[in-house]
């Protein structure tokens, strides 16, 4: 376990050369990498979301591509297309930017549904079809999609079924005053600071195997299942004491959320140098895993209740094993 903790600490140290005050964002993205899942990031422009994922790709020695999603984007612009070569009289494949290890899907909610579907299909299946041929995407394959919480005009909201495919949703906030002072003094020179490759793709895959092997007691699994049960409105009819929570939820989390929570909890334990999962690991990842999987009711909007507040209430309500 110590070697994995050392590798992750090296990754954090390299990221800190460029990124100030975004320790939580870095740790959460690294968690998603090891858990082999994709991430949706919400935050206003200028909070170093692009710099964070680009830096992590460099540290891991992975190929990085950025796709700027716009209303006029076509699925072929993402996945690739067939090009007719007149001198040969044949079609050749031109692969799209999705053929990379790390993809930044910038402002994914700016593109129409058919483009979102093409991107999300690639995320889920790890392959794309161009013409009549199906092509495997490179491994490891990681997508970080961003969306802006403001300026919602001209956007296409991601359907709940598609949101569920993201392992985590991260919310990036403004840096603290002392960190912002350091950022301003750097005058935007952070992207030019060199970083070293400290974790190879082979080591990343090895770390994923180690995370899968983390011990998880049945009591922890029961704890996760109980958390999911309270997110479902039907639970209010069986457990009246949870009604104060479920009345704010229109649709709850699916079993996929439980799988994601267990995966992330195992990685959290690995990063802490443990070979077993504690309830604290589940609590540490609960907000990131659940916040985009809860569809809130009109009552929640009326009372100005957020998904994070509901998740906090659920964690307080469920007994810790």
Ranges and model annotations:
Residues 92-101, 130-147, 158-167:
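AAA+/SF3 P-loop NTPase mechanochemical coupling elements
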Residues 28-31, 84-104:
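Conserved alpha-helical scaffold flanking the Walker A/P-loop in AAA+ ATPase domains
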Residues 44, 78, 146:
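P-loop (Walker A) phosphate-binding loop of NTP-binding proteins
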Residues 1-25, 214-215:
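Dynamic helix-loop-helix/coil hinge segments at AAA+ ATPase domain boundaries and subdomain interfaces
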Residues 97-124, 138, 153-162, 174-182:
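Conserved AAA+/SF3 P-loop NTPase catalytic/coupling segment centered on the Walker-B
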Residues 1, 235-321:
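C-terminal engagement/docking regions of AAA+ P-loop ATPases
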Residues 75, 79, 155-209, 217-227:
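Conserved AAA+ ATPase core "coupling" helix
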């Amino acid at each position: 376990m110590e070697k994995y903790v050392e590798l992750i600490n090296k990754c954090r140290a390299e990221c800190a050369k460029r990124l100030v005050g975004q320790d939580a964002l870095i740790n959460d993205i690294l968690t998603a990498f090891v858990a082999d899942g994709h991430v949706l990031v919400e935050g206003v422009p200028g909070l170093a979301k692009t710099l964070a994922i680009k830096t992590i790709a460099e540290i891991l020695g992975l190929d990085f591509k950025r796709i700027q999603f716009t209303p006029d984007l076509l699925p072929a612009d993402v996945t690739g297309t067939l090009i007719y070569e007149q001198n040969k009289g044949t079609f050749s494949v031109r692969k799209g930017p999705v053929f990379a290890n790390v993809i930044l899907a910038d402002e994914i909610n700016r593109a129409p549904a058919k483009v979102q579907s093409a991107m999300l299909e690639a995320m889920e299946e790890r392959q794309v079809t161009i013409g009549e041929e199906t092509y495997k995407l490179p491994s490891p394959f990681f997508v970080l999609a961003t969306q802006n919480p403001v300026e919602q005009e001209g956007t296409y909201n991601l359907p709940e079924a598609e949101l569920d495919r993201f392992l985590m949703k991260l919310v990036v906030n403004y840096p603290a005053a002392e960190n912002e002072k350091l950022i301003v003094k750097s005058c935007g020179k952070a992207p030019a600071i060199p970083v070293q490759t400290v974790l190879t793709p082979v080591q990343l895959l090895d770390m994923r195997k180690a995370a899968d092997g983390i011990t998880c007691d049945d009591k922890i699994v029961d704890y996760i299942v109980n958390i999911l049960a309270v997110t479902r409105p039907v639970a209010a009819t069986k457990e009246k004491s949870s009604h104060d929570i479920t009345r704010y939820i229109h649709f709850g989390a699916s079993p996929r959320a439980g799988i994601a929570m267990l995966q992330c909890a195992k990685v959290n334990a690995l990063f802490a140098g443990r070979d077993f999962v504690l309830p604290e690991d589940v609590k540490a990842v609960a907000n990131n895993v659940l916040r985009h999987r809860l569809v809130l009711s009109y009552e929640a909007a009326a009372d100005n209740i957020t998904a994070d507040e509901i998740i906090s209430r659920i964690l307080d309500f469920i007994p810790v094993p």
